[in-house]
Amino acid sequence: MAKTAVFDVLIVYSDRTAISANTDRVDVFEPFPQGTNNADYNVVYGYFLTTCWKNNLSAALTTSADISGAGRCRSYWLFKNNHWIKVKKTGYSRLIFDKLSPVSRKYRVSRELLFSSKQVKQFNHEDLFQTFFDKQKTYNQLSQFSAPTVTIEKSTAASIRKACFELKAMINNHPCSNDFSSEIVMKDRFGAGGRDVYKFKAGESVKMTTIMKKSKKSFILQPLVKFDKVDIRLVYLAGKIVQTYIRVAKEGDFRCNEHQGGLLKYIAKAEVPAAVIRQAKRLIKILNKTTTLFSLDFMVSNNGNIYLIEGNTGPGLDWNLEIKENELAAQKLIRLVVKELARLAYIKVVI
């Protein structure tokens, strides 16, 4: 029987994002497919694994397709001498850097298997993950910080009309109802990266129904906040703000995400509006789960009111390869994450 390789940390991605090291394809030399939006992750996670190994932290990357037990995988990727290496052997770690979102039953089952032992722990806090993964749950727990949010129960015209009616009532009762335009936003309830986010005018329920039936996903409705198409992200690690940046939507769009053409610009913490920092502090007191990596995204309405857009326990570690400033900032965050991973794995840090 082949010996199991034991790692200090195992990075786990879904097999829809990364390719299993167990693939028989001879033309696959990297985990993240070229020609996709995720191709740059090959550079990002190459740097991540290199930083781990430089600090005597053994690390590998695997996919949901490889999960074979608690903390266990049937194959994995290594990064050595600036090259990715496929290893078709069993790997194990009790510390997981989790990038696997349970967006379907398949991934829920894989994730449950991965963490089926109490001996295996994830880098991020499970309760916080569950709160931020579900946008309706985010609103239910943090409604005082968020724009009104309603889930569309079914992909039918009747359900959409009902949700729109409920949302309208919530807007009318909101103390800052003037912050909201007449347009509404429909979002994938469990989505990320600005994907499956749509804007509609009143009376466009037929279009909404068509999109829902085609996508077969669960959606929420929110009012479109009147703002300057800029959002602010605060990145926290071990209870402290370690990174701050703004994202500016591209011309003609309202989504600020980089994946949707938004421009990311790093700023100093001192440049973040003081009111946003105060709001974030109030929110964090309620969360009471700060010993982890997570981010909070805020927008400021044209009237000066602050809204939480979403939280994320897996903020992107990637960067625009064409912008050196972004590369250096992202690499700094990776080094901080590795430092915290080393602490959790009881390894002496040399960063």
Roles of regions detected by a PLM:
Residues I267-R278, K285-T291, V300-I351:
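C-terminal active-site "lid" helix and adjoining low-complexity regulatory extension at the edge
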Residues D8, R94-L95, Y307:
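Structural motif
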Residues A60-S64, Q222-P223, I232, T291-N303:
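A short glycine-rich, hydrophobically flanked beta-strand micro-motif that places a catalytic Asp/Glu
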Residues A18-N42, N257-L263:
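A solvent-exposed, charged loop/short amphipathic helix patch at secondary-structure junctions
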Residues F180-E183, F190-E271:
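Phosphate-binding site of ATP-dependent enzymes
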Residues K3-L10:
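Extreme N-terminal starter segment of soluble prokaryotic enzymes
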Residues N38-K154:
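Conserved N-proximal alpha/beta basic substrate-recognition cap immediately N-terminal to
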Residues A2, L113-K121, E126-F219:
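Active-site nucleotide/adenylate-binding loops and adjacent lid/helix of ATP-dependent enzymes
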